[in-house]
């Protein structure tokens, strides 16, 4: 089965909490990558901070 452009434009899914989780995971990954040079503790702190920021924006964008 193939979907055309019209059908693809009408796909709706997810919710606020799902967006929050995905954004938090993405923010954590970005934070960890950004702070690799600061060692494991720096990566942990940046990962938590990135998750908090990503989760906040994922939750409030709706």
From Swiss-Prot:
Coiled-coil boundaries: none
Superkingdom per UniProt: Bacteria
Biological role stated in the UniProt entry: Heat stable bacteriocin active against Enterococcus faecalis and other Lactobacilli.
The species this protein was found in: Lactobacillus johnsonii (strain CNCM I-12250 / La1 / NCC 533)
Disulphide-bridged cysteine pairs: none
Family to which this protein belongs: Belongs to the bacteriocin class IIB family.
InterPro entries: Bacteriocin_IIb_lactacin-rel, Bacteriocin_signal_seq
Pro-sequence residue ranges: 1-14
Assembly behavior: This bacteriocin depends upon the complementation of two peptides for activity: LafA and LafX. Associated with a 180 kDa bacteriocin complex.
Identification of the protein by name: Bacteriocin lactacin-F subunit LafX
Keywords from the named record: Antibiotic, Antimicrobial, Bacteriocin
Gene Ontology biological-process entries: defense response to bacterium; killing of cells of another organism
Name of encoding gene: lafX
């Amino acid at each position: 089965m193939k979907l055309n452009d019209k059908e693809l434009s009408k796909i709706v899914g997810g919710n606020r909490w799902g967006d929050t989780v995905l954004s938090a995971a993405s923010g954590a990954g970005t934070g960890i990558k950004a702070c690799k040079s600061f060692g494991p503790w720096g990566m942990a702190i940046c990962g938590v901070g990135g998750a908090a920021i990503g989760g906040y924006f994922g939750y409030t964008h709706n």
